[in-house]
Design a protein with these regions (language model features):
Chain C
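Conserved ABC ATPase signature
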Residues: 107, 148-155
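Conserved ABC ATPase "signature" region
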Residues: 20-23, 115, 119, 126-144
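Conserved ABC transporter NBD signature motif
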Residues: 74-85, 89-91
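ABC transporter nucleotide-binding domain
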Residues: 191-279
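Catalytic Walker B motif of ABC-type/P-loop ATPase nucleotide-binding domains
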Residues: 173-177
Length: 266, 263, 320
């Protein structure tokens, strides 16, 4: 197990050598955050109750959304596809280390580092613009952690799956691009999913999207408005269902990919 | 004089033709990317409708006005991306040293470095955007003069975009960090998808007068509906030509300080 | 054609301290003197080779002469132009070929790049056809000009680079390490090509290389440069006359000779009977040859020059 801890530390070290790049990356993430935040702030300032959200609730939602965004959605598994293409992946496969676990710990280091920074950023931002800090309902914290773990693993396996496209095609950016667009709109990072009309929202709950990001963030920011509208058991069941699907699909395509791929290039 | 223009045009056409040949080699990618862009366009469009189904006005802007703003943004963003695609490939040219072989050719390097990668396929996407934009504009009661002013200011916005891309090239001669610079520009530009008024005072001021996103996108639409002050119109032209001049200066300085790769 | 007087080029290399704020706002830089008051003149139809170790300043010189780099100080005139200004009339008359760098578009065929260059250099149809034919004939490369460049081998690609660069019949050709990384056969082909090209088109060719083979085969004039200073500017044969103090005397002995007799010549560097080789100073040669003729019974006596490589190496060593 120690070797995975080493992976963790190594990933952190990598970040420190690419400091400038990393900080510019955080700047970009923050700029991206400004659009939905201000849009919805302006909307709720004007309309006191927008689909169940008032100013306070929207501030709370986006506070936690920015804080958790990279932690849940961020990943380094994007590198995998190009590593397959270049043959670099062989280096990892020939070592006595589990591929899945290696990338999981790499991601973990990545996520924790970004978590600290995003908290720092959002804290500073709220201070400077004198926006009141939101609070959270501790009663729902266990639910939050449940959906957080579900979301983390769901994202992990889904991202792996997309990276495995590299086994069959040289154009690895294409599916990731589409996936990225779908996620940025439908995950809940641009708008809280439950502002959608009731029918649409119920439909979306059958897709994997809400479980990727929206549900954990909702549970920590303003769970009260959601709890009465949905059946907790059924959404938890749905989320787990998708997790199992992605888990088996990624294992399956991993095995298939290894067999079929001829590791051309270097 | 005309001979020169004709020759430059011929070179440009050849470069564009070559660029088309290269992109058609990766058909799969082309389809996916186009699909992705259309998807994003539609989804964000949907959000606008979603917001306005529950409220009539946002920060002084009506639904139709916000739509026209969004479509204007799309047009300017897509158009400059189509034209200046080659700028995104500048860094590998500098790092590999192949840039030198371009600088030694007897034609203006901008023909190749700025305009040499025109994406004809993406250009096709521009047509439906343009069509939608004009459709929505003509549904409103806009005077001919306002529409003219709008067009001029859109072109002005494109000049700012051009200045920016030239600036990136100049920067690229001095440092290898330009990938980040381009990406920050795209992120900042994205702030212009919605009216600049939704941002709180300080930020809104910054993005109008210092990093002129507001000038590029919000101003033309404001002019269309007669909300743009004369002062701001003058400022718009001033800033675009200033930035253009600045960017060309940056390129020239970059050339003098250029140290080339390897040896 | 080319006049360079007291050319100075200083590079500013930024030092990364590892501390973030320092690296962005208070960058420290080190100044490297790449060219230190370099002067020379090159006329029409010359083939000049610049040699020197890595970092000597060869490529820097070429890049300044072609207008890519801005000189820090000094006078540079090529074909009457100041190269950095990159005037079209100037650029149309020169060409730059760098080994390991490409002007060919990798995803398309070489012919596609040729056609682009035809427009850029404003070559008329007849001239284009004629030059293309001549150049491809020298390389016997008629078939490969229509293949995607990324599919070609390194040697084939280099040949295509040459054709692309010479279609417009430049008056001055700059070649920066043109044979680097190529196999022996490709190197040979490129060397033959350069020789033939100069004969046919009467261009001025300036070549930099690490390979002495390139220099020996092609250049009549040699400029040796190290640490930004010109150490030698003259013909290849004259360099031995000027700098070499050493001759090698090889003996094949007829019969066994007493060691003391042999050692009177000096300490041999090769002592594998019947072969003995001595390293002697030039000025001692007459005395030693006379001695050998009188006292040593030999089957064969050969006197050889020091290898040019050795001469040049010692030139660099002495500079320190």
């Amino acid at each position: 197990m120690y070797k995975y801890f080493a992976v963790f530390i190594l990933t952190l070290k990598e970040y420190f050598s690419y400091r400038l790049n990393f900080l510019i990356w955080r700047l970009r993430v923050f700029i991206g955050f400004l659009v939905p935040f201000f849009l919805w702030l302006t909307v709720t300032k004007q309309v006191k109750n927008f689909a169940g959200y008032d100013e306070k609730a929207i501030i709370s939602y986006f506070f936690f959304s920015h804080f958790l965004s990279y932690f849940i959605l961020g990943t380094r598994t994007v590198d995998i596809a190009s590593q397959i293409q270049s043959g670099e992946i062989l280096n990892l496969l020939l070592k006595p280390i589990s591929f899945f676990r290696y990338h999981f710990f790499r991601d973990l280091a990545d996520k924790i580092l970004n978590l600290f920074l995003s908290f720092f950023e959002i804290f500073l931002f709220f201070e400077i613009f004198s926006i009141p800090f939101p609070s959270t309902n501790f009663q729902f914290l266990p639910l939050f952690f449940l959906f957080l773990i579900l979301g983390l693993f769901l994202n992990f396996y889904l991202n792996l799956l997309i990276s495995f496209w590299g086994f069959w095609s040289t154009e690895i950016w294409a599916p990731r691009f589409i996936f990225f667009i779908l996620i940025s709109i439908l995950s809940g990072s641009f708008f809280p999913l439950d502002v959608l009309p009731k029918e649409l929202f119920s439909l979306i709950l059958f897709t994997p999207f809400p479980y990727l990001f929206f549900l954990p963030v909702k549970m920590i920011s303003s769970p009260e408005t959601l709890i009465n509208k949905i059946n907790l058991n059924s959404i938890f069941f749905m989320g787990s269902f998708w997790l199992i699907i992605f888990f088996f699909l990624s294992c399956f395509f991993w095995q298939k990919g290894l067999k079929n791929f001829s590791f051309w290039g270097r | 004089m005309f001979k020169k223009i004709k020759r430059n045009l011929k070179i440009l056409l050849l470069l564009t033709y070559n660029s088309l040949k290269i992109t058609s080699q990766s058909r799969q990618g082309m389809i996916f990317f186009t699909l992705g862009k259309i998807l994003r366009f539609l989804l964000l469009f949907g959000i606008i409708f979603l917001v306005f189904s529950k409220t009539k006005i946002i920060a002084g802007w009506s639904l139709k006005q916000v739509i026209i703003l969004y479509l204007t943004f799309n047009f300017i963003d897509t158009f400059s991306q189509v034209l200046y695609r080659e700028v995104y490939r500048f860094r590998p040219l500098v790092v590999s040293g192949n840039l030198d072989l371009i600088l030694v050719k007897p034609y203006h390097p901008f023909l190749r470095l700025l305009l040499g990668g025109v994406d004809l396929f993406d250009l096709l996407l521009l047509l439906p955007y343009l069509f939608l934009l004009l459709l929505f504009i003509f549904q409103e009661n806009v005077s001919f003069f306002s529409f003219l002013l709008y067009l001029v200011l859109v072109v002005n916005g494109l000049i700012i975009a051009t200045a920016f891309h030239i600036g990136v090239l100049g920067f690229g001669l001095l440092t290898t960090e330009i990938d980040n610079v381009i990406m920050i520009y795209r992120d900042l530009l994205n702030l212009g998808r919605f009216p600049i008024e939704i941002y709180q005072q300080v930020i809104s001021l910054i993005f109008t007068f210092i990093i002129p996103i507001g000038v590029m996108i919000t101003f033309p639409v404001k002019a269309l509906f007669g909300f743009l002050s004369f002062k701001n119109i003058v400022f718009s032209f001033f800033i675009s030509f200033f930035l253009l001049w600045l960017s060309v200066k940056l390129w020239q300085i970059g050339l003098k300080r250029y140290q080339s790769a390897g040896g | 054609m080319i006049v360079v007087k007291n050319l100075i080029k200083i590079y500013k290399i930024y030092q990364k301290t590892g501390r973030l704020i320092t690296d962005i706002f208070f960058r420290k830089y080190e100044e490297v003197l790449a060219l230190d008051k370099v002067s020379f003149e090159i006329g029409k139809n010359e083939l000049v080779a610049f040699i020197g170790p890595n970092g000597a300043g060869k490529t820097t010189t070429l890049k300044i002469l072609s207008g890519i780099l801005f000189p820090t100080a000094g006078y540079v005139s090529v074909l009457g132009f100041f190269p950095f200004e990159k005037k079209e009339a100037f650029l149309k008359q020169i060409s730059f070929i760098m080994g390991q760098r490409n002007q060919l578009i990798p995803d398309l065929t070489a012919m596609d790049t040729f056609l682009l260059n035809k427009e850029i250099y404003e070559i008329d149809d007849y001239q284009f056809k004629k030059n293309l034919q001549k150049l491809t004939a020298i390389f016997s490369a008629e078939k490969i000009i229509h293949q995607p460049v990324k599919m070609l081998s390194l040697g084939e690609r280099m040949k295509m680079e040459f054709i692309a660069a010479l279609l417009h019949q430049p008056r001055i050709v700059f070649l920066d390490e043109p044979t680097i990384g190529l196999d022996i056969f490709s190197q040979e082909a490129i060397r033959e090509f350069i020789k033939d090209y100069q004969k046919e088109f009467k261009a001025t060719i300036i070549l930099t290389s690490h390979y002495l083979e390139d220099v020996k085969r092609l250049a009549k004039r040699l400029i040796i440069i190290n640490k930004g200073k010109i150490l030698y500017d003259g013909s290849l044969t004259a360099i031995l006359q000027r700098f070499s103090q050493i001759k090698y005397v090889s003996l094949i002995l007829e019969k066994k000779v007493k060691q003391e007799a042999l050692f009177k010549i000096g300490k041999p560097i090769v002592y594998q009977l019947p072969k003995v080789i001595f390293q002697v100073e030039k000025k001692e040669l007459p005395r030693i040859v006379a001695y050998i003729n009188n006292k040593i019974p030999y089957l064969d006596l050969v006197i050889e020059d020091e290898k040019i490589e050795e001469v040049i190496k010692s030139l660099f060593k002495n500079q320190r």
